[in-house]
UniProtKB/Swiss-Prot annotation:
Function: Bidirectionally degrades single-stranded DNA into large acid-insoluble oligonucleotides, which are then degraded further into small acid-soluble oligonucleotides.
Entry GO MF terms: exodeoxyribonuclease VII activity; nucleic acid binding
UniProt source species: Hahella chejuensis (strain KCTC 2396)
Name of the protein this chain belongs to: Exodeoxyribonuclease 7 large subunit
Enzyme Commission number(s) from the entry: 3.1.11.6
Quaternary organization: Heterooligomer composed of large and small subunits.
GO biological process terms, semicolon-separated: DNA catabolic process
Cellular compartment(s): Cytoplasm
Keyword Secreted carried by entry: no
HAMAP family named among the record's database cross-references: Exonuc_7_L (MF_00378)
Entry-linked InterPro entries: Exonuc_VII_L, Exonuc_VII_lsu_C, OB-fold_nuc-bd_dom
GO CC terms, sorted: cytoplasm; exodeoxyribonuclease VII complex
Chief location category: cytoplasm
Amino acid sequence: MSELSPHSPFSVTELNRQVRRLLEVSFMQVWVTGEISNFSCPSSGHWYFSLKDDKAQVRCAMFRNRNMFVKQRPRDGEAVTLRAKVSLYEGRGEFQLIAESMELAGEGELRRAFEELKLKLSREGLFEESRKRPLPAMPKQVGVITSPTGAAVRDILTVLERRFPAIPVLLFPVPVQGKEAGPAIVAAIASANRLNCCDVLIVGRGGGSLEDLWAFNEEPVARAIAASAIPVVSAVGHETDITIADLVADLRAPTPSAAAEKVSPDQAEWKHRFLIYEQRLDAAAQRLLRQEGLRLNQLRGRLKHPGRRLQESAQRLDDLEVRLHRQAQNLLSVRRNQLTHLRDRLLASSPRQSLKNRYATVDALNHRLQTAVLSVLRHKSQHFAKLCGHMEAVSPIATLARGYAIVSDENGQIIRSEKEVRTGQKVKARLSDGEIHCEVVASV
């Protein structure tokens, strides 16, 4: 913001613009609770009102693209909580709040409790699609758990009467609002399961505020729905109302009327389906009659006189007898030839000749083995003698035998040079046949 100067004053428009920007930057978003007053809604659809407490008030605006998400239009005197941006209406220089969301005061705690329970049950898997059961195509009886005096039960009965009046309905009357509602709904679900006379249950009520619908957000109600052996359709409030019961139920219907549509077959559709089945059955029966008539005519044409059938059978029997006799003779001849052939092969392969040949083979192998062993022994003896000669040639004993001696000092250390001895030193000389002890007289 530029510095204040009498030579460069702000215009009113510029001042309001600067103040608006400063407010919007300083207060990004605030939550404010107060009482509605001076509420108005012109044809534009925007809401204008004041929010006040016992000491102050502030002008507020909530544009149509935001207020369309508020469940019901507020009235003067209602306490609400706003999420808003702080701003300034430049045209009048009027400080105001631009509301982003609105809920009745006290609904914030309920909404937090709703989110906590929703997270808890979600982690337990109660919202999983895999645990939800299909509804029966043709229920024998529909159970309805709702208020007996509300609009919901009238809507449900009207739809069921229109779609399929033959389906009986069993009403479990319960309060749907207040502290008694939750336990009553739980007890009704338990009763329906205990009676076990309904194929599907509708649990619901008409629309209302979050507080009005709270019984359907209570944990015992959610767990009763999840534990029900009978499939449950939840129909709470309007389409925009989502409760914990909706998330746990096997099917969520946006309204009680829609729930009745979901659980009941369409009578007209079933009549049409039965008509189609009747036509198909009649056509199939006519087709079968024609086919069997043709088959009967064919069989009638093929049917012969019994005497002729007997003659043909007797002739066929004689023919079979001749063929059987001929085949028996052929089989005997074949078996006789096979027996002769086997006898000749047995004589040709006598075990006496085979044993004789085996003995000759063993004798030959034994002779070859003895010859090989003697040859190996001679070769190894010659090689050993040669190795002994080589070892004898390089042996120190052989060297001593040629007149050499190995001289060592008193400690047994070999003396290799005359520099390693001194005059008068005792030494030993090893010869080929013993040792002699000597004394060094001189070294040259």
